[in-house]
Amino acid sequence: MTVATYEVEKQFLTYVKKIENYGEALSLMFWDLRTGAPKQGVDQRSEVIGMLSSEVFVMSTSDEMGNYLTELESLIVENKLSETTKKMVEECRKEYDRNKKIPQAEYEAYVKLEAKAESVWEEAREKSDFEMFRPYLEKIVEFKKKFITYWGYETYKYNTLLDMYEPGITVEVLDHVFGQLRERIVPLVKEISESKKELKTNALSEHFSKEKQKNFTLELLKQLNYNFEAGRLDETVHPFEITLNRGDVRITTRYDEKDFRMAVFGTIHECGHAVYEQNVAEELEGTPLCSGTSMGIHESQSLFFENFIGRNKSFWKKNYDLLKRYSDGQFDGVSVDEFYDAINESKPSFIRIEADELTYPLHVMVRYELEKELFDGTLQVKDLPAAWNDKMETYLGIRPENDAQGVLQDVHWAGGSFGYFPSYALGYMYAAQFKHRMLKDIPNFDALLEEGNVTPIREWLTENIHQYGKTKKPLEILKDVTGEGLNANYLADYLEAKYKEIYEL
């Protein structure tokens, strides 16, 4: 490497690090907004977030950034850069080209709107009043449609949004794999509804104090390899994980004293996200590569933890006595087998994050269909509540009674995250495929859970997935780890085997 090459690379890395530092400050502000910032400070905080986001936007689309990218791309051709820097240039170029097409004033207005919209959504959800939130959502959708015209699209406008969260995934791919999954899930849901087996679920809805739930979930987090030296657990309306840096990865949860599953499984889910972020390779710190490679791969890790670990019978053989010690005595007459069946009960429900493993993908499909229709122009925002309710009835056979139970339950649209929801189902499919491959290397998977030893499992995930951050694309990771492309049958096989055993079908 020549002195000139070294200098331009060094200057570029310093410039990018400044952008990442602004991003860390923004993450801290978003975390604060959603974990208890005073209501009267929301408008000013939104102003600050808008200003800092605008600064990041300006830096990422500046002539200086453009010059760095052009110069470094010529060095890539001459093979004079490290692999990590090459990947960073590719990542920054993608963001540069995307953001350069959006006028700065429009971007700043959008970010301010988004910050305010999340607070309005929260209040609208509490009051179950979609009309309160509708004007904000209409503006967000309007902005997104305008942005798509700037970015361009292939075949479907929605494909552009999907690519932001899951490169390589399109409407055509999703229609195919969702169709495959639906063909096998829907008949199984019907079989279960006709099953005579009754699960003992009463204990799940008995009083379980918030403080005891918190202490129990803290114990589980330690067992699951969540590093409290590099994170913390807080309370919020809608659980999430947020990364400030790989040494500060925070998770939040929500407690319901009449249903402990919300906190326990929600926390395990967010733990999967956090463990991913905490175990990205250290040398990627301070670069745009120091995070999960896509939303789908990220969800594969959270769902792997929540379902393949947290809803596994062996996990509860280890932790059931611990649960009993923390609870208020409601599980004293319930065996671990009965408890396992109960927490895996399958029946249609209104709330996505409370859905069981089997019906969960159907919740995602509802949102996917609505988003497609919003962006192909066949559905208007004002008609969302009715359209939501109709699709819930079609897919799950139930109809929400109010907006909080229906269209207002998720924060994603308030944050402009259209194209994100399919990642949940993709993540589920990825996770099942990873688990199938992992068993070849760790055939004693269940025995490890029964011992409370999650470390070998976490280490396998780190070695094969976590450490790479964004240096590998999602479908590249899937192919490298499993030796094949996306295959929905692994998830369908897992669900059929599990639920036929539980319901004795």
Region annotations inferred by a language model:
Residues 2-4, 8, 40, 44, ...:
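C-terminal, non-catalytic "cap/extension" segments appended to globular domains
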Residues 2-167, 496-503:
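A well-structured
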Residues 12, 152, 269, 302, ...:
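Divalent metal-coordination and catalytic microenvironments
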Residues 110-262:
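Contiguous, non-catalytic segments that form substrate-binding/exosite surfaces or channel walls
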Residues 178, 182, 210-214, 220, ...:
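All-alpha helical catalytic cores of prenyl diphosphate-utilizing isoprenoid enzymes
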Residues 229, 283-287, 311-321, 381-382, ...:
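Acidic/polar loop patches that form or flank catalytic/metal-binding clefts of enzymes
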Residues 262-281, 299-303:
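Active-site recognition of the HExxH zinc-binding catalytic motif
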Residues 291-332:
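Post-HExxH zinc-binding segment in Zn-dependent metallohydrolases
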